[in-house]
C-alpha cells in the first residue's frame, strides 16, 4: 500500500510539472502569433495603400 501511494504521488508530481511546462509553451506561442499578425497587417496596409490609388487587392506572401 505504501509503494502504491508513492507511485501515485510521483505520477501526480510529474503530471503537474508536465502540464505547467506545456502551458508556458502554449502562452509563448500565442504571444508569437500576435506579433506575426501585426507584421502581416502592417505589411499589407503599407503595400496596398501607398503604391496606388485606388488601392488594388493585395495578396500577402509569407
Curated annotation (Swiss-Prot):
Mast cell degranulating peptide. Antiproliferative activity against human breast and ovarian tumor cell lines in vitro. Inhibits granulopoiesis in rat in vitro. Causes histamine release from rat peritoneal mast cells in vitro. Has antibacterial activity against Gram-positive bacteria B.megaterium Bm11, S.lentus and M.luteus, and antifungal activity against C.tropicalis, C.guiller-mondii and P.nicotianae spores. Has hemolytic activity. The mature peptide inserts into the hydrophobic core of the bacterial cell membrane and increases permeability without disrupting membrane integrity. This is Peptide leucine arginine. It is found in: Secreted. It holds the Pfam family FSAP_sig_propep. GO terms for biological process: defense response; defense response to fungus; defense response to Gram-positive bacterium; inflammatory response; killing of cells of another organism; mast cell degranulation. It comes from Lithobates pipiens (Northern leopard frog). Residues 21-41, 62 form a propeptide. GO terms for cellular component: extracellular region. Disulfide bonds join 48-58. Belongs to the frog skin active peptide (FSAP) family. Brevinin subfamily. It comes from the Eukaryota. Residues 1-20 form the signal peptide. InterPro entries: Frog_antimicrobial_propeptide, Frog_antimicrobial_Ranidae.
